[in-house]
From Swiss-Prot:
SUPFAM superfamilies: Acid phosphatase/Vanadium-dependent haloperoxidase. SMART domains: acidPPc. The lineage of its organism: Bacteria, Pseudomonadati, Pseudomonadota, Gammaproteobacteria, Enterobacterales. Gene3D superfamilies: Phosphatidic acid phosphatase type 2/haloperoxidase. It comes from Klebsiella pneumoniae. InterPro entries: P_Acid_Pase_2/haloperoxi_sf, P_Acid_Pase_2/haloperoxidase. This is Uncharacterized 22.5 kDa protein in cps region.
Length: 209
């Protein structure tokens, strides 16, 4: 099993442009603009919380040694926030059963991405679980909001839009270029925090003075 490839399904290189494409496609139709703003707000909040947790750790050393916790797993959180909604929207024209299956598939994919982060030793168990719960909370809230929509047609995406949305992640997955988010956050953390260099997992597990 190529766990590096599976992990890439949660990389910012894939998910951020794909999320932007989804927002643009939804904004093209007047009936789905509210949907677009709801989606972007919840996805953006998820990403912001992930970044804040990482900055708090790298800049100020705020982690939990007993849980080997250094911040939310971004791959896990963004996958759980993105893939269920992405697949739900792609299947919006089909039966309720198929839409539910699409959502479940999205959550399963997110869980597999989270597991891949454990296999390649990129995150601890607590970080992956926390990330999955955070992302799932955002996507679940989005789906609950859609149950109240007065116009079911508003979630229907044109076939051209579907084609574009499918192509974007496929092209990005093929690129294999990983986003330098961790190093970028490390630079920001040292710029705004009191430490001379980013706090690390090794630092977390050093004996307290």
């Amino acid at each position: 099993m190529n766990w590096q490839l599976i992990s890439f399904f949660g990389d910012s290189t894939v998910l951020l442009p794909s999320a932007a494409a989804l927002f643009i496609v939804l904004m093209l139709r007047k009936t789905s603009r509210l949907l677009a703003w709801q989606w972007s707000l919840l996805f953006g909040i998820t990403g912001a919380i992930v970044c804040a947790s990482k900055l708090a750790f790298m800049g100020w050393g705020l982690g939990i040694r007993e849980l080997d916790y250094t911040g939310f797993s971004g791959h896990s959180a963004l996958s759980a926030a993105f893939w269920p909604i992405f697949l739900w929207l792609l299947s919006a024209r089909f039966s309720v059963g198929l839409r539910k299956a699409a959502v479940i598939t999205g959550y399963v994919l997110a869980a597999v991405v989270g597991y891949s982060r454990l296999v390649i030793h990129a995150h601890s168990f607590s970080e992956v679980i926390a990330g999955l719960l955070l992302g799932a909370a955002g996507s679940a809230l989005f789906l609950v909001l859609q149950k109240r929509t007065p116009d079911p047609e508003s979630v229907h995406i044109s076939w051209g839009g579907v084609a574009c949305l499918v192509m974007v992640p496929l092209i990005l997955l093929h690129s294999g270029s990983k986003a330098p988010t961790q190093s970028l956050l490390g630079q920001i953390a040292t710029a705004v925090g009191p430490l001379d260099k980013p706090f690390t997992r090794t630092d977390l597990h050093k004996q307290a003075w």
